[in-house]
């Protein structure tokens, strides 16, 4: 079992309860080593709390992974991010370049790195892997816009992993709720084994029978499993489409514009995700019997 968290609401008491319940591992996302830029990216002042939480995780004896969410506006601090992971006594660092679906797709121009940035990051990671062997394991996820073949997202839909949201929904991957036509069963209502084996959501893209051409006749169909369903749906509107990051996808052209413009345009401001809170009209709450003045 693995907890993926921002770290801003975790207490030592809660971590101890997680440990006693059998939690195996914790991952904490860190947006940058520069506190000011970290909070600009996150849109929330939580950098110091994240670092404190990392210390608490190690204090209670849980293994720590630092999730370094990297992109165009923080890759210049990749070396210091690696150093920070060592300082925090992390067992593992995931240098994960932003994947462009969900809210990241809305900020694609602000996030997508240049090819030069990506090549430099790859060199830094390869050097650090050698230097820190036996000290820090480093996973490296590149933006698949630059790839010729898609990644095997989650090792294939419904094959190896599942994700449980704070509300109890059981998902085949972290971003699966972006597939808004699917319904996800809740662990509060049904046994986890039943959801894994029988739910419509987990069976929707499991295996290869759902695949169109060219995936269906591809010799890699049981290697990359058709790529990312969330990305295919976000970029094409067709959940069954071959992932556009594949060089053989009929939708590969949707990546041409962002890739041709990266580094040439001015970096836009971030579009932040905000929770809209209903405000009472003229100071009158929604439970009031009074009518607002016209």
Across the structure, where does each feature detected by a protein language model lie?
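Short Fe-S-cluster ligation motifs
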Residues: 200, 243-288, 293
């Amino acid at each position: 079992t693995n907890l993926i968290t921002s770290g801003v609401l975790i207490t030592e008491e809660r971590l101890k309860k997680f440990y006693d319940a059998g939690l195996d591992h914790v991952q904490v996302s860190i947006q940058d080593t520069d506190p000011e830029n970290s909070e600009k990216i996150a849109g929330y002042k939580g950098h110091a709390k994240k670092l404190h939480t990392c210390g608490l995780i190690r204090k209670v004896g849980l293994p720590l992974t630092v999730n370094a969410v990297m992109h165009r506006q923080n890759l210049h601090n990749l070396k210091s991010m690696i150093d920070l992971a060592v300082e925090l006594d992390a067992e593992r660092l995931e240098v994960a370049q932003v994947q462009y679906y969900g809210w990241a797709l809305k900020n694609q121009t602000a996030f997508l790195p240049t090819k030069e940035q990506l090549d430099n990051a790859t060199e830094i990671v390869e050097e650090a892997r050698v230097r820190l062997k036996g000290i820090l394991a480093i996973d490296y996820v590149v933006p698949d816009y630059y790839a010729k073949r898609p990644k095997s997202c989650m090792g294939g839909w419904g094959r190896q992993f599942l994700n449980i949201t704070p509300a109890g929904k059981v998902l085949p991957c972290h971003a699966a709720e972006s597939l808004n036509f699917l319904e996800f069963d809740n662990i509060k209502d049904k046994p986890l084994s039943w959801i894994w084996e029988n739910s419509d959501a987990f069976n929707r893209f499991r295996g290869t029978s759902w695949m169109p051409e060219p995936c269906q006749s591809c010799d890699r169909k049981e290697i990359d499993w058709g790529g990312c369903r969330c990305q295919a749906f976000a970029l094409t509107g067709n959940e069954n489409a071959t992932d556009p990051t594949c060089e053989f996808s009929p939708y590969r052209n949707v990546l041409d514009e962002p890739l041709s413009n990266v580094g040439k345009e001015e970096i836009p401001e971030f579009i932040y995700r905000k929770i809209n809170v209903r405000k009472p009209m003229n100071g009158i709450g929604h439970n009031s019997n009074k009518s607002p003045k016209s």
